[in-house]
Structures are given as structure tokens and as C-alpha cells.
């Protein structure tokens, strides 16, 4: 019987690189997702849909040692365990609040639940058959550190299956803010080509597949509330400081309404699904 334990935090405090995207403050990422732990599963429909596709892709093999990196609430960790009941499964997340939630709701699913930085995992070299990660990589400044870490812990022939957000994500929201102020209100994301180049540079072989997911909402304000409810609002250092005034917010909503379709106000997610093997 698996026994889930909490071990000490393994969060890197090393300087972050920039990649001209606006540096990500990891402490704010952890804080944001900790605050969203209780509401995440109710609101993260797109993230769950992408995660289910990753679980389906993972079933092509028979891994014995698996890590779920950026495990969040543990919902997908549970899905992985259902797919591979005999596997040794460990789960890590940057957010203490998410790990606490996962322990409370999915205690015996993983052998280890731990707070850890995906760029510096407490995992032995060449020890894993499958590295799994859903919607976590986009919170890094430079994906090369993550791909290098995944390559380090994978056995030869082991697989990395992960997802990230790409350049066109939430372009409707960014356009709605354009002209209201000079700040950036949506995180900057990499292209599929940049992601693939980073993976190959770290000794991985495979591809980054692109897809568009469009979710419809009653209003632009509902889009923003959902993003906050899953902890995914803009946390890069170049974000505008201070409160968003009611007058500016009304202008954003008016701009966003120009995108309205029959189903409602769209929010587009440009998703990259990475399927790689260690050479």
C-alpha cells in the first residue's frame, strides 16, 4: 500500500534568466496557486481537458517509475495512478497550498507529495520512465532548465509528456487591453518552435504539437475571474502595478465585447503538447 508523505521543500533560489519575456517571480507563482487551490478543480476546464489528453498519450508505454511535476491539486496524479496502478508515483509542485490540498484529497495516490521547483527536482539521475507535467512549464523564464532536468532524471528511452501555453494564448484579452494602457496584462509565452529547440538542445527527441482550445464566457469580467480563480493571472515582473480602475476596466470590457460570438465571449488557449524521449 502506498504511503504519502510530505518532505521538505526543494525550491531553487538561484537567479532567473529573462528571455525578454518579463521575469517570473516564483514566490508569486507559488502564492497565487496556493490561494487558488480550493477553486482550481471547479474552474480549470481547459487544463483538465489538456491533462486528460496527456494521460491518454502516456498509456502508450508501461512505466514503472513516474513523477508528476507541477501536480497541482493532484487530480491528474490520481488519473495517472488509475492508468498505472503498479507504478511508483511521486508528485511535486511549487505551491505549498496545492500540495496541502492534494494530500487532503488524494493522500494514498502518490508515494511522495512534495513542494519542489521543477528546475531542481529531488530525484535521482536516470531513475524515471515517465516524466509527466500538465500546464506548468509556462511559468518558467527559460524552458531549457526544465528540459535539462527532465533529461537528467529520465532513463534512456524514458518519456517526457508535458504541456504548456504558447504565443497566442488569451490574445483577445491582450487586445482588449491594448490602447487602455501601456502595460502587459497577459503573460508572454513562447512559440512551439522555441519550445522544440529548447528540448532538442537538452538531448531530447520528439515534437511539440500545437492545438487551440476556445472557451466561451458570459463576459470579459468572467474571463478574468476564472483566471484569478485558477491562479493563472499575469505574474510576470513587467505587469502593471496597482489596482485596475473601474473606468479602465469598463473600457476593457467594451473592447472585449467586440470579440463576442454567438456562444459568448471567447478566450483562446494556444496549447503545446510535448512528447519527447531521452536519447
UniProtKB/Swiss-Prot annotation:
The UniProt record lists the keyword Secreted: no
HAMAP family the UniProt entry points to: BioC (MF_00835)
Example GO biological process: methylation
Gene Ontology molecular function: carboxyl-O-methyltransferase activity; malonyl-CoA methyltransferase activity; S-adenosylmethionine-dependent methyltransferase activity
Pathway given in the UniProt record: Cofactor biosynthesis; biotin biosynthesis
Enzyme Commission identifier(s): 2.1.1.197
Name of the featured protein: Malonyl-[acyl-carrier protein] O-methyltransferase
Family to which the UniProt record says this protein belongs: Belongs to the methyltransferase superfamily.
Disulfide bonds: none
Organism of derivation: Hahella chejuensis (strain KCTC 2396)
Job description of the protein: Converts the free carboxyl group of a malonyl-thioester to its methyl ester by transfer of a methyl group from S-adenosyl-L-methionine (SAM). It allows to synthesize pimeloyl-ACP via the fatty acid synthetic pathway.
InterPro entries: BioC, Malonyl-ACP_OMT, Methyltransf_11, SAM-dependent_MTases_sf
Amino acid at each position: 500500500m502506498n504511503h504519502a508523505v510530505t518532505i521538505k521543500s526543494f525550491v531553487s533560489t538561484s537567479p532567473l534568466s529573462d528571455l525578454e519575456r518579463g521575469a517570473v517571480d516564483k514566490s508569486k507563482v507559488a502564492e497565487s496557486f496556493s490561494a487558488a487551490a480550493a477553486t482550481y478543480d471547479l474552474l480549470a476546464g481547459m487544463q483538465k481537458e489538456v491533462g486528460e489528453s496527456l494521460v491518454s498519450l502516456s498509456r502508450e508505454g508501461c512505466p514503472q517509475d513516474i513523477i508528476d511535476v507541477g501536480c497541482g491539486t493532484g487530480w491528474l496524479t490520481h488519473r495517472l495512478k488509475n492508468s498505472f496502478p503498479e507504478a511508483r508515483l511521486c508528485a511535486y509542485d511549487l505551491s505549498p497550498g496545492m500540495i496541502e490540498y492534494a494530500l487532503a484529497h488524494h493522500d494514498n495516490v502518490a508515494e511522495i507529495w512534495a513542494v519542489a521547483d521543477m528546475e531542481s527536482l529531488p530525484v535521482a539521475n536516470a531513475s524515471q520512465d515517465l516524466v509527466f507535467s500538465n500546464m506548468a512549464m509556462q511559468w518558467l523564464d527559460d524552458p531549457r532548465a526544465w528540459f535539462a532536468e527532465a533529461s537528467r532524471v529520465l532513463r534512456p528511452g524514458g518519456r517526457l509528456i508535458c504541456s504548456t501555453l504558447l504565443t497566442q494564448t488569451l490574445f483577445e484579452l491582450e487586445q482588449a487591453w491594448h490602447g487602455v494602457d501601456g502595460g502587459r496584462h497577459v503573460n508572454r509565452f513562447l512559440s512551439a518552435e522555441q519550445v522544440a529547440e529548447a528540448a532538442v538542445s537538452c538531448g531530447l527527441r520528439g515534437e511539440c504539437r500545437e492545438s487551440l482550445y476556445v472557451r466561451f464566457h458570459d463576459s470579459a469580467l468572467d474571463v478574468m475571474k476564472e483566471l484569478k480563480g485558477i491562479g493563472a493571472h499575469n505574474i510576470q515582473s513587467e505587469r502593471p502595478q496597482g489596482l485596475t480602475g473601474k473606468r479602465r476596466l469598463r473600457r476593457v470590457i467594451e473592447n472585449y465585447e467586440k470579440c463576442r460570438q454567438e456562444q459568448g465571449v471567447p478566450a483562446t488557449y494556444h496549447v503545446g503538447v510535448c512528447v519527447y524521449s531521452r536519447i
